[in-house]
Amino acid sequence: MAVCGRVRRMFRLSAALQLLLLVAAGVQNSHGQGQGLGVNFGPFAGQAGGGNPVGQQPPQLPQLSQQQQQQQPPPQQQQPFPAGGLPARRGGAGPGGTGGGWKLAEEESCREDVTRVCPKHTWSNNLAVLECLQDVREPENEISSDCNHLLWNYKLNLTTDPKFESVAREVCKSTISEIKECAEEPVGKGYMVSCLVDHRGNITEYQCHQYITKMTAIIFSDYRLICGFMDDCKNDINLLKCGSIRLGEKDAHSQGEVVSCLEKGLVKEAEEKEPKIQVSELCKKAILRVAELSSDDFHLDRHLYFACRDDRERFCENTQAGEGRVYKCLFNHKFEESMSEKCREALTTRQKLIAQDYKVSYSLAKSCKSDLKKYRCNVENLPRSREARLSYLLMCLESAVHRGRQVSSECQGEMLDYRRMLMEDFSLSPEIILSCRGEIEHHCSGLHRKGRTLHCLMKVVRGEKGSLGMNCQQALQTLIQETDPGADYRIDRALNEACESVIQTACKHIRSGDPMILSCLMEHLYTEKMVEDCEHRLLELQYFISRDWKLDPVLYRKCQGDASRLCHTHGWNETSELMPPGAVFSCLYRHAYRTEEQGRRLSRECRAEVQRILHQRAMDVKLDPALQDKCLIDLGKWCSEKTETGQELECLQDHLDDLAVECRDIVGNLTELESEDIQIEALLMRACEPIIHNFCHDVADNQIDSGDLMECLIQNKHQKDMNEKCAIGVTHFQLVQMKDFRFSYKFKMACKEDVLKLCPNIKKKVDVVICLSTTVRNDTLQEAKEHRVSLKCRKQLRVEELEMTEDIRLEPDLYEACKSDIKNYCSTVQYGNAQIIECLKENKKQLSTRCHQRVFKLQETEMMDPELDYTLMRVCKQMIKRFCPEADSKTMLQCLKQNKNSELMDPKCKQMITKRQITQNTDYRLNPVLRKACKADIPKFCHGILTKAKDDSELEGQVISCLKLRYADQRLSSDCEDQIRIITQESALDYRLDPQLQLHCSDEIANLCAEEAAAQEQTGQVEECLKVNLLKIRTELCKKEVLNMLKESKADIFVDPVLHTACALDIKHHCAAITPGRGRQMSCLMEALEDKRVRLQPECKKRLNDRIEMWSYAAKVAPADGFSDLAMQVMTSPSKNYILSVISGSICILFLIGLMCGRITKRVTRELKDR
């Protein structure tokens, strides 16, 4: 740019401005367009100053006073006034121009145009006429070329006379004294006014400011009047084809188009990687300086003024010009449907210039001037990149705000406006244009308004519409940091409009613009209050916020100290290769869950914020950068069909063993974290809110969870208030926990040392539980002095064992073995509440061998430790509290059996106890008490049965039947006899407790005793029915079982419930002193029956006689147990003579054969025998 005076400036106005001031001797009130500053000028050009006549060379704008005085007018037209100045005023016309001075309106070449275009009341004021003429653009009101030429020469002649400067010194006296730079300008050179224009923003004196503003408007009407502009941009104008600089080829208004064309060339260059045409550095500075000096009044941007004049009237009619207010108003309405396209384009160009130089925004430069200086965000600190200025300054000031520094409210307001502006229109960010052009054309064409393009690109980044290049993604991330919408959701217009209804309902308690609005929206994600459009926009923005911890202002404010101390982070707008933004949050959450022993923990406030972010990230895997990055392939491979909320993470957890190593580690770490703080699972917490409120509020209120909340949810999983979503979520987490014992936080913390010592290299939780529980059981059975498993681990191990019994899926080995059986026999049964396990038990005889074996093992474990029998514990929970509050877990079932027939016993519990008794009686191994009591008797009397037995299949009551027969013979040990008596008594009351009877007499029971078997309460009626119908039984095995029953009843009256009931009073009267057992009371009753002196109850007498007959019959048909029984049967048989004859004859025949056939062995000599 040419030197205008003794100091070279980035931009100077021509001397015309300074000399124009000379005619002003005061300020008067005028009318119409001249109102406000009533200075009446002599003959000079107006704002619309146009081209020169054809053939005239463009005037060389003066650089020195001598050049100004030597400037000659065009030769084609007579110069209306001398170069030295204006004609003498007629009639002493005052400065207002209302006297008899020279009138522009009276000149012949302009009279017709003034009369046609300008209101009559303005004719006497030259300034008003100039404003009127230069603001004309309609073709029908076009100014004649002669008038344009007059105006141009008028302005040009003014630039040649330096004597008018004194007037400006009078009008701006106090201002000049305040601005030292202007006061030091030499007098009479014309530089002082140019200096005042440079400092127009600092002028507070009203008259001076108005005067300088009006003069600036006049000069800005023609780029050729700007000092040095044409020298600096001449080549660029030709290169960019912005219009000829030859005289006469452009009309008055096209001179603003030249500047506009240069501006477009400047912004286009910034948007191309390899621009074909580059604007020279001098011209760039000139263009930006012109834009800066026109930043306060939109009249000074001639192209924008004419393009937006109608829109200004439509949208900003009541907005007063000055201080950039009209610009801002038009910016706010840029995307209105009724905004003209030419105005929108001009506004966009203006905004792009602001993006390159913040001073092009008057309001931003003025409001933030002191803050920029205070926080050293001045130009000297800027990077050299051409597009970084506005973004750098915004980030510099935002950094100060985030550090808690005080930035003026006016400046913050301006920052908010321009951040919103950048978010609304992607084209204002050169980096987006450069890096995302292909993606925009391919995915987001036609979405150019209200921030929709940026959100479209965000959607692509999230993987919902294709893929995005890394450069584009990085450009988007940078733009999000520059605009910082996390600090105020209103910056993102697309989000603001989409979520307005949600904010008004769900977040109305939070102040508008508060950063917590975004958190509130995240908390209501996937709820009834959330609308779909808001959900999409919110997740699109959160995708980027989650990748840079600084973009969450609340997190940054609460954690910047911890991040600096623990993660070695830098300032808000600084980055580090060693600790990239995405890695900082990972660092924070690793420290958030450290124990006090591990040290270096986060502050309480920061920890709460980290937990908040973790809760939000659990909503969507795409909000967890590390998870999405490492698991992208696995998500596509295993979870492509899992599109519902929260399903993707669950899917990854379900396929944990199949995932790639890096993805498995990430998912494993996240799951381990969830086990410590299940509130991270925000969707699960939302589903379980009623249960938490009613049953777990104490542990939920704890700031440190440590797995207590999940444990509480598991314990209350089957409460009536439990909803399906919560139950499914809790069960799923339990299933995930089975994959690795680390996923059970309390178990891990209680048993990690024991696992390392006793179960090394075991990973799966179920295997760890089996390993530890086996160790505990062995130590207990061997009565070891000291348990190898620590006490705290044993306690938590018990909790884990009990939890695993609730669902067959929590016991993977059993579940895998029985999958096909579940499908075949339990397809209609729901998982949970141990219902599938119970179903398998009921269908045990039909199960596959492998499943049957697993179920038998499970039952054996449950009988040894009834507390592990989930169904029994659930059904009999209240009865256990009533009858067995002090009972040990091992003796729980025994206690319940003893109280089974109590009147206070719950029928459902009684039914369940009976079920377990039936199970126990199928195999002695399922009855630990019997097994221990008969340890010596079983191998002694039932050895043959044991040799045929298999380890994992039932003996169907054979051993117990064997022991019952020995009980009748009174050959058992006392402990074993006591247990068999109890079993015999119970099975006498309920035939279902006798497996052998059920097995062999099922048809007879169905045919002969169907009514008795259908009775709800079994009191021995089926057994009595079989005894009565003994002669009708054809099946030998069934008959044998009934005979055995008769034999057992003879051993003890308690074993015959019908007889015992009938003879209860008689026993009390006649046999009270007799000790029960070994048939003693039965013998007493028999003696009483034979004694004529004793009168028994009729029912007792009848039953006794029936029993005697049955026993007599049984004795006849019962098979011999030994040789003595066999001899007795032969001697009492009616055919005994025949049997004895056959036996004797057989012996005689054998003797005769021996006599006749001789010896069988070979004869040898005596010598050989004696040897």
UniProtKB/Swiss-Prot annotation:
The chain crosses the membrane at residues 1138-1158. The keyword GTP-binding does not apply. Widely expressed; found in kidney, pancreatic islets, parathyroid, thyroid, adrenal tissue, brain neurons, astrocytes, adenohypophysis, cultured pheochromocytoma cells. GO terms for biological process: bone morphogenesis; intracellular protein transport; negative regulation of protein processing; negative regulation of transforming growth factor beta receptor signaling pathway; protein processing; regulation of chondrocyte differentiation; transforming growth factor beta receptor signaling pathway. Keywords: Cytoplasm, Cytoskeleton, Glycoprotein, Golgi apparatus, Membrane, Phosphoprotein, Repeat, Sialic acid, Signal, Transmembrane, Transmembrane helix. Cys-rich GLG1 repeats lie at residues 108-141, 142-204, 207-270, 278-338, 339-405, 406-465, 467-529, 530-596, 601-660, 662-720, 721-780, 788-848, 850-903, 904-971, 972-1027, 1033-1093. Residues 1159-1171 are cytoplasmic. Pfam families: Cys_rich_FGFR (PF00839). Binds fibroblast growth factor and E-selectin (cell-adhesion lectin on endothelial cells mediating the binding of neutrophils). This is Golgi apparatus protein 1. It comes from Rattus norvegicus (Rat). The gene is Glg1.
